[in-house]
Regions:
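Short helix-loop "hinge" at the ATP-lid/N-box region of the Bergerat-fold HATPase_c
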Residues: 89-90
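Conserved glycine-rich
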Residues: 160-161
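Bergerat-fold ATP-binding/catalytic subdomain of histidine kinases
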Residues: 25, 128-139
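Short alpha-helical segment of the dimerization/phosphotransfer core of two-component systems
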Residues: 7-12
């Protein structure tokens, strides 16, 4: 009973935090504490923090953060974006699957690709995936606020970047954070 209660309390806490941040983003009240940051180091830290969750679920988490990616941004908010992308990939990947996180420079931008072997996202759901409170038509078993990707995309936009999606049902998804 205690583990279930702890899990539910954690969900309510995350929901409250997400609602608060979403409201602040909507009202343009989020200020970035910008400085030089190393996107590959932030990515490595997030992946390290998610390793136990992936192992517990039976998901292999692979990382390739060897490419130096200096960016100008708010390290806390960048970690928040990466945390959302990596934990989503773990949640939507079945046991025995794999999540791969790769840092690379592409077309003069710093990019982090988070690719999973999960269920994928139906083409009709893809245009709405960054919308507030959105859940895919196939998502019936995951606790979610429906705000994580919205918040991640809005934070990426504050950094003058974006999150791109490539997905195929039954084959998985790839979310790519790209920053100038």
């Amino acid at each position: 009973l205690l583990p279930v209660l702890q899990e539910r309390v954690g969900f309510v806490r995350r929901l409250t935090e997400d609602l608060f941040l979403a409201a602040k983003l909507e009202q343009k009240q989020v200020l970035l504490n910008e400085d030089r940051a190393r996107l590959e180091a932030l990515t490595a830290a997030v992946c390290s923090a998610c390793q136990a969750e992936a192992a517990h679920k039976g998901v292999e988490l692979r990382t390739d953060t060897g490419t130096p990616l200096p960016v100008w941004g708010d390290a806390v908010r960048l970690e928040q974006i990466l945390q959302n992308l990596v934990t989503n990939a773990i949640h939507y990947t079945p046991s025995g699957g794999r999540v791969t996180v790769v840092c690379a420079a592409e077309n003069g931008r710093a990019c982090v690709k988070v690719t999973d072997t999960g269920c994928g996202i139906a083409p009709e759901d893809q245009p709405a995936v960054f919308d507030r409170y959105f859940h895919t038509t196939a998502d019936t078993k995951h606790d979610s606020t429906g705000l994580g990707l919205t918040i991640a995309q809005e934070l990426a936009h504050l950094h003058r970047g974006e999150i791109l999606l490539q997905s195929e049902p039954g084959r998985g998804s790839c979310f790519t954070l790209c920053l100038p």
